[in-house]
Each structure stands twice: as structure tokens, then as C-alpha cells.
């Protein structure tokens, strides 16, 4: 790494970041077990990983785990507000190129994603570790643009305009870059629901040129990170942002998937009266039987003190909903992108910045709303994201996926797949001792009776946990 091969807020924060990183390691047994298991064999020796995932303390432990088992890594954050600057500094100080600043502009965001593919020797990356599929989309859209520039001519949003401009800059600076980079990729591992959806769309359209491992639908990710992580980090973000008393407030959670379930539990545990909106009759019935009132936002918006979106879809909270809410209603998103709330529809109204990632927006009738993290992930923008322990499970999946893709790339087709069940169970097993969990062991007779081995896997792939 050259002296300039990183962009962080302040490299002097490295010592502070290192102290927190050391603490996080004690709460991330899965990642530490990976270091112990694979440090000798170095299965990622020769891997050149371009990582785009929230640059937090927990991600720093992931990065150092990948490096400890042989990988070379370049990193950016997957959200303009999610970087923890001391974490980025701690990683940069070790010689790992990292490009991440809390509060970076959208233009900088795409510049930093480009930077994770710019290795000093000029050779391409061979793996992508992604969150939201932005890094993957950058390479694939760029390679398409190298054969047809017209696809960059009509951006639909401000962010897409900046995205296209970055592609154009790279095409001019390095002709053929995207096509060469696409051809070198052995595979990608994707962290989130939103990113997995994008990858499935690419596969459906015949535009996925390499294998993709869906981390999100590993049981030890979706049923833990998405649910239990949100259960802790949502209320943390709201409290740090607003200092409001949540108990007694009426909160509406839009969506009751795994993230919605965790979010509803988070608010309910803080004493809020929680209502849920849903499009899916199965999830709606689950919410009702968990004790929540299931409502339509058109009807219920006026009752809300807090509205949280969790869906991964767009236009969930529209301008007409925001006109109905109570004065000083808190709006936040814990889904993925900033279009779950129609933030663009608010741009012509007066904004007052209260503090970083907290804005008050005033309507013509004098009503005010509090918007958290400009509609982006509030648990990372207004707080520090999920706790280390639950992220250890998610990130252990990432490490195992990167090893699979690098060492067994011929085993996977150019499609979206999940890690095999035995690895999912391995991830869970690595986290049991930390919580003092003692497993019961099947006898040979019991195992034969249900058609498994005493060592597992214990459930068929179609089992729903």
C-alpha cells in the first residue's frame, strides 16, 4: 500500500479504534475460530477481495480475519453514514487500503467503490464481498457500458447520475477495465436481503456472469442478524438520535419479515405500543398472533409517534402519509436503501439539521417531522449497528463463503446459491460455548429413526426455522 492508498476521516483515531477492536474480538468467537482453524492452511492465499460493507468495528474484525487466512483486501463502506471513523483508521493503520468516511457524499461513495478495485499492481480483484450489491453492480454495469455507452445516458435519480459519472470516469481513465475485472471474478458473497434480490434479478435476466453466495439466507444470518440484531440496534439508534421516551409511544413498523420482527420486538420491549403494516397475509397473520395490531398505513399514519420501515421496497412511507402524522413524528429506516421513505419528495421543504444524521423538516402548515439518517439505515447512521456477537455469526458465514468461492469455484454455477447446511450448523456451533450452551447428542438409533447422522446436518434444506 502506498502512503496515500486509503481515505479515512483521521488516521490519528487508529489507537482508539484498535482498543474497541480488541474488545470486539472477545465477542466474535466464530471469526476467531476461523483464524485458529485456517491460519496454517491459508486457504485465501492469492485472494484479492474487494469488500463493500459497513466499515464498523465488527467489520474490522472480519477484515483482519480474512487477512489472517491469506487474503489481500481493499475496502469501502456500503452506506454513506455507516462508517465508524475510528474503525476505518485502525484498519488503514495496519496497511489495508480502506476508503470510508462517516458522512461521505454520494459522489465520494462511488469514488471509494471504484478505489476498492484499483490494486497498485494493476491486476484485478478475484472476489467481491458485498452488501447491497453496489460493488457488484458497479462492475457489471460498467462492463455493459463498455459495449453500449447509451445505457448511461438516462439516469433516473441523482444517485444514479453520480453512479453513471463514476463509470464514465473509469472508462475514460482505463479502457476495458470493467470487462477485464468482470472476467477475473471467481464469485461474490452478498450480505443483505436487498442485495440478494438484485442478484436474483440479474440471474433471471441472464446477466450474472459468476457464482454468488447468498449470505442473507443462511439461517445463522437471517434468523439472528436480521432479527436479534435489529432487536437491539433499532431502539439504540432512536434513543441516541432523539433522546425521546419510547415507552407509551405509538410506533408503526412497516414490514414483518425477519427485520420487521426484530424491530417490532425492539420497540415493544422499550414499552411502545406497536402496530405493523404488511402486504403478505402470512406475515400479517404472524404479526397478529405475536400480539401486534396489523393496520394499513393510509389509515394509521395519523396515530404514529414513530414510523420505521423494514421492507427493502420503495415508497413505503409516501409524502401523503407524512402529511398525516403527528407533529414531531420520528421517521426512520432499517431496511436498506433511502427510498423506503420518500425523502426526495421532502427536498423543497425547509430542513433544520439538529445534529449529525438528525433533521427536522417543516411542512407549510407548521407540522414538523424528525428524519433519521436521511432515510438511510438509522441503526448504523445514528448508532453503531448490531452487537459484535450477532455479527460474528453473519461474518463467519462470509469467511466460509469466500473460502468456498476461492478454493472451489468450479463447484458453483453462475447463479445465486446458499452455503450448504453443514456450514450453517458449523457457524452456530462455533457460538455455543460463549453462551454456555450444552447440546444433547443423538444416539445412533435416534439418528437412524429420523434419517440423519449424530453429527448432522439435522434438518433438510427446506426446513423453516
UniProtKB/Swiss-Prot annotation:
Q: Describe which pathway this protein belongs to, using the record's wording.
A: Amino-acid biosynthesis; L-homocysteine biosynthesis; L-homocysteine from S-adenosyl-L-homocysteine: step 1/1
EC number annotated for this UniProt entry: 3.13.2.1
Binding site residues for substrate = 56, 131, 191, 221, 225
- Keyword Transport tagged: no
| Record carries keyword NAD | yes
Required cofactors, per record?
Answer: NAD(+)
Name assigned to this protein = Adenosylhomocysteinase
Provenance organism: Bartonella henselae (strain ATCC 49882 / DSM 28221 / CCUG 30454 / Houston 1)
